[in-house]
């Protein structure tokens, strides 16, 4: 394989630029040419394809977002869109593609592979909801951004004796809420993987203020459960009388310079994706397991998800065997500040 392309698709994630940089530099070192595709699959179909060299990826490792831009392109789910994209790739002499993104992006890569066009996936999403990897690119940065924000919210919460509901991203997976909540010492964490009793939530708030002598209460809520405003309304209807505020961290979690960890794993996975294409291997997704590079069928990575579930005892049972187990219940309460 002499010429490959790289694209980013779906929601952006800090560290995507580091992965693109690694793909380009590794490919050049292997004597391969690299082309960039702007705007993901939309740019592929439109022929928005151009050469990438070391100069184009210089100084990109510290930048958030993706300089190749990103877009959601549902038309690529249709055969017509897939064939149009492959036609453009062949027109530019491209023999394989590295796709950086989440589950929707993986489905596109899977379709390319089914048509006999080699594609390798790199997990780039802050939600950490891709199977076959312990961590996705952008997750660590998003968690650190959330923790920094929650720490600041605790300051103002303590000053006024308030309850704060902090809504974070995570439509189908509560990983950001779980990790950020534990790291910030949140008092309660509400995730899609666990059913909650709103009356118990209210009782815990009351106990903290009246019996434990606390002057704040922080609840981290994954957006996949419901909106922060809707959750606050349920709290009030269930009898919560605390001075309640809602903050939605929203898209701020997608921005910012990637952490050292995100830069490193993005670089590892980007280089490994090139190695797989050089060997003629398509239909695979790259991942990190126990700090080592792994690969798995892209079909499974796209379909299985990486969601965890919680037992009655509060233990996390991970559907993705490449993810760690945590004692959720113990950490959630014993580490709350």
From Swiss-Prot:
Where ATP binds, per the record, is at 11, 72-73, 102-105
The enzyme class is transferase
The species this protein belongs to is Streptococcus equi subsp. zooepidemicus (strain MGCS10565)
Kindly list the cysteine pairs connected by disulfide bridges. none
Task: Name the chain's protein.
Answer: ATP-dependent 6-phosphofructokinase
Annotated function = Catalyzes the phosphorylation of D-fructose 6-phosphate to fructose 1,6-bisphosphate by ATP, the first committing step of glycolysis.
Pfam families given in the database record:
PFK
* Gene Ontology BP annotations: canonical glycolysis; fructose 1,6-bisphosphate metabolic process; fructose 6-phosphate metabolic process
* Keywords from the named record: Allosteric enzyme, ATP-binding, Cytoplasm, Glycolysis, Kinase, Magnesium, Metal-binding, Nucleotide-binding, Transferase
The record's catalysed reaction(s) read: beta-D-fructose 6-phosphate + ATP = beta-D-fructose 1,6-bisphosphate + ADP + H(+)
* GO molecular function annotation: 6-phosphofructokinase activity; AMP binding; ATP binding; fructose-6-phosphate binding; identical protein binding; metal ion binding; monosaccharide binding
């Amino acid at each position: 394989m002499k010429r490959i392309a790289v694209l980013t698709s779906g929601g952006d994630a800090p560290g995507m630029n580091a992965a693109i940089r690694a793909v380009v530099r590794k490919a050049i070192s292997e004597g391969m040419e690299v082309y960039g595709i702007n705007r993901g699959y939309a740019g592929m179909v439109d022929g928005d394809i151009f050469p990438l060299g070391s100069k184009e990826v210089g100084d990109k490792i510290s930048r958030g977002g993706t300089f190749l831009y990103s877009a959601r392109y549902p038309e690529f789910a249709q055969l017509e869109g897939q064939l149009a994209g492959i036609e453009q790739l062949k027109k530019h002499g491209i023999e394989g593609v590295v796709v950086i993104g989440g589950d929707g992006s993986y489905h596109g890569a899977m379709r390319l592979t089914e048509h006999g066009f080699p594609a390798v996936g790199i997990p780039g999403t802050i939600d950490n909801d891709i199977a076959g990897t312990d961590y996705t690119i952008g997750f660590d940065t998003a968690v650190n951004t959330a923790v920094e924000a929650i720490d600041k919210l605790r300051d103002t919460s303590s000053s006024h004796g308030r309850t704060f509901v902090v809504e974070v991203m995570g439509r189908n997976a509560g990983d950001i809420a779980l990790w950020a909540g534990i790291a910030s010492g949140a008092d309660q964490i509400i995730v899609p993987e666990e059913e909650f009793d709103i009356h118990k939530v209210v009782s815990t708030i009351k106990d903290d203020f009246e019996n434990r002598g606390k002057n704040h209460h922080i609840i981290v809520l994954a957006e996949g459960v419901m909106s922060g405003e809707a959750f606050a309304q349920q709290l009030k209807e269930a009898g919560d009388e605390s001075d309640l505020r809602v903050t939605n961290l929203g898209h701020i979690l997608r921005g910012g310079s990637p952490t050292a960890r995100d830069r490193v794993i993005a670089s590892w996975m980007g280089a490994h994706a090139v190695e797989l294409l050089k060997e003629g291997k398509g239909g695979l997704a790259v991942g990190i397991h126990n700090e080592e590079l792994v690969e798995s069928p892209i079909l499974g990575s796209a379909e299985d998800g990486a969601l965890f579930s919680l037992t009655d005892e509060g233990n996390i049972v991970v559907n993705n065997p490449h993810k760690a187990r945590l004692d959720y219940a113990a950490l959630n309460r014993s580490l709350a500040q």
